[in-house]
């Protein structure tokens, strides 16, 4: 992935911004056994973690801890991490993006959510117990950890990998069973990993032109200062400092920052924080009674460097809130890049069907993902994938965050469902689209399940709700049709999306977890709309568009509140072979036909000299 992402960590007196290294890629030669497994379409055996666990337990003894926690996240709480930060995957063998590993002197457990139950069951070896998060009767990872820490046992964790809030919560849970939590600055997994641990990737930091960003960074900093002035904490922002490996700065980036911010080495942040805490402690004026304002996503180690809870107020980052409300230039960029990205996906699906059906080609899931990348590269302003493409055939489609690997992936079966979840990073926006296709003859149940998911998708797209409504409140709009049939899906319905930034962005979203009830949806948010259905061991269905939240006109305005709705921006047709018009209402059929007419209008000009793709698009956008 060539995407550059920066996570903004902040505290005040002064403000600090942290630039996180982007995710890198690594490759290694395939063994004979891997080639044989590919040929036979067999899943790989789990990684044998016996020796790794033995080495870790020896280090635990040396550091006087009885239980050790291995989070998924890096020191910036990133969802997508560099290979060198994949500590949980290394120690457990489970490669999904979410989960937590806990190792005691005699047991090991891996907790993950419903997206990864199937994947984890296949990847964990006999040393591990799978804790299925959210399943009745299954303890949370915190509860399981507390059970292992009974009677005065000590639990250790790298304090840079969990937030201060999570550390406090865990500490309270442990106290109930007589355990305690300590931070161990030297990461024990890194020691076990040794020289085999991948190097941290280094990419160039570049400038996003104001023509695409919509607002110069000086205005954003000034808006942040005004926001902070209302917080009345220990000091105002008087300068901006960036802690970064400055060798990564392009000449343009260095020039833009010159005279406006102070550049300091990345690792200097902790010493600088300690100095701030000491200066506050020795202050004789009123500043000593104030607190530092710190992101609630900042690490426990940073909070400790500032003097801990008594010196720090943890809040949701105002930078996170500001990023979630796109400006008009960013919104127009989203619309434009989704037309180009839609054209790329249309070209890919037409190529794939022709290759499988007309040419009889044998293509595996990685071949498909690679071809899609090659097609996207042709389109203007493309920089790279926004995440690893989920190219999944048949049963693999039921693995919600499946990642095909060349050594183990399946050959695409033209007689099975094919789910493709992919996205691009364009200089004018970020895309994330999922379509489920069938190149043969789907079963009646597959068509019914597809219709139920599509109905939920349309229900979200058509939703109108008063300002102040959360994504939690509208999540059931997407699930209601599945619920009537006794079906459901184990993931959120929608997430925020960054503008040439993270494809998953907060603070708002649409889902059934309590977190989605915290922040209301707002005009100029960009979110995904992606209900699904998954039959383990058989197939998966997910239909995802990105939408812009916007104010809508209503006949009345109860309580003088504005009402909000959505504008779809993804331009990719739904699968005609899976569309059964008899399962849709007249209004739903009209929505599909109107959507397909717009897809044709926006994308067909790209294929005036591409008869294959144009014919495919014409067929897939015909009225139902």
UniProtKB/Swiss-Prot annotation:
Residue sites binding Mn(2+) 2 per the record: 421, 432, 544
Keyword Protease part of the UniProt annotation: yes
Keywords: Aminopeptidase, Hydrolase, Manganese, Metal-binding, Metalloprotease, Protease
InterPro entries linked to this entry: Creatin/AminoP/Spt16_N (IPR029149), Creatinase/aminopeptidase-like (IPR036005), Creatinase_N (IPR000587), Pept_M24 (IPR000994), Pept_M24B (IPR033740), Peptidase_M24_C (IPR032416), Peptidase_M24B_aminopep-P_CS (IPR001131), X-Pro_aminopeptidase_P (IPR050422)
Coiled coil location: none
Residues annotated as binding Mn(2+) 1: 432, 530, 544
Position of the signal peptide: none
Class of the enzyme per the UniProt entry, highest EC level: hydrolase
GO BP annotation list: proteolysis
GO molecular function: metal ion binding; metalloaminopeptidase activity
PROSITE patterns recorded: PROLINE_PEPTIDASE (PS00491)
Needed cofactors: Mn(2+)
Alphabetical list of Pfam families matching this protein: Creatinase_N, Creatinase_N_2, Peptidase_M24, Peptidase_M24_C
One CC-aspect GO term: cytoplasm
E.C. numbers: 3.4.11.9
Catalytic function, reaction form: Release of any N-terminal amino acid, including proline, that is linked to proline, even from a dipeptide or tripeptide
Cofactor remark: Binds 2 manganese ions per subunit.
Family: Belongs to the peptidase M24B family.
Entry function: Catalyzes the removal of a penultimate prolyl residue from the N-termini of peptides.
The protein's name: Probable Xaa-Pro aminopeptidase P
Originating gene: AMPP
